[in-house]
């Protein structure tokens, strides 16, 4: 049953995080630079880095609440924060090669798959 609460907390947090990210894109519209998304990515990275060690020490806070904040709210606000936190965790745990490969593979792979998606999506529009 506790897992159900965690799912609900993550879903609600994700909805709020996504809504907050959308609000930032309205406040800071794209004019030569995606300020809203840039702010969400860097702000979310800071928030996840700041809150994770605090939440780990707070044993009185239920796991569902912790996951709702980190995976849900901040993850919904920006997936960049989770990627950055996972990379840092790998490096801190001595997995220098794995962390470095994960970093490079995620960035280059992400860019490559976005480009592939654009190409395939454009083909579908011209047929």
From Swiss-Prot:
GO MF assignments: fluoride channel activity; metal ion binding
Catalysis performed (reactions): fluoride(in) = fluoride(out)
Membrane disposition: Multi-pass membrane protein
UniProt-annotated binding residues for Na(+): 75, 78
GO (cellular component) term, any one: plasma membrane
Pfam families linked: CRCB (PF02537)
Localization in the cell: Cell membrane
Role noted for this protein: Fluoride-specific ion channel. Important for reducing fluoride concentration in the cell, thus reducing its toxicity.
PANTHER family: FLUORIDE EXPORT PROTEIN 1-RELATED (PTHR28259:SF1)
Protein name: Fluoride-specific ion channel FluC 1
Species whose genome carries this gene: Shouchella clausii (strain KSM-K16) (Alkalihalobacillus clausii)
Organism taxonomic ancestry: Bacteria, Bacillati, Bacillota, Bacilli, Bacillales
Gene (name only): fluC1
